[in-house]
Amino acid sequence: DIQMTQTTSSLSASLGDRVTISCRASQDINNYLNWYQQKPDGTVKLLIYYTSRLHSGVPSRFSGSGSGTDYSLTISNLEQEDIATYFCQQGKTLPRTFGGGTKLEIKR
């Protein structure tokens, strides 16, 4: 199985900040990389698929980039509603494995 690693398990930022969350695959996944958002209430939403394609209805402050084994999710102008845990997922092979998640919190 392909292993997905998110080395930062939690991240603290201020409202309005630009935040970048990283993800690494154990082998080349040819841009088959998705990002999911899990809100504190458990709601899960697909944000980005195929590295950089924004899912319908997702605000443009979210963006994705990367290639090969290294990928990132960037949130520009952080808003309160962005407080959540973010997971990367590879879609190249089955099983479609996930990273361990990065919990984003507001710096007070």
From Swiss-Prot:
Residues 89-97 are annotated as: Complementarity-determining-3. SMART domains: IG, IGv. Disulfide bonds join C23-C88. GO terms for cellular component: immunoglobulin complex. GO terms for biological process: adaptive immune response; immune response. Anti-arsonate hybridoma protein. This is Ig kappa chain V-V region HP 124E1. The lineage of its organism: Eukaryota, Metazoa, Chordata, Craniata, Vertebrata.
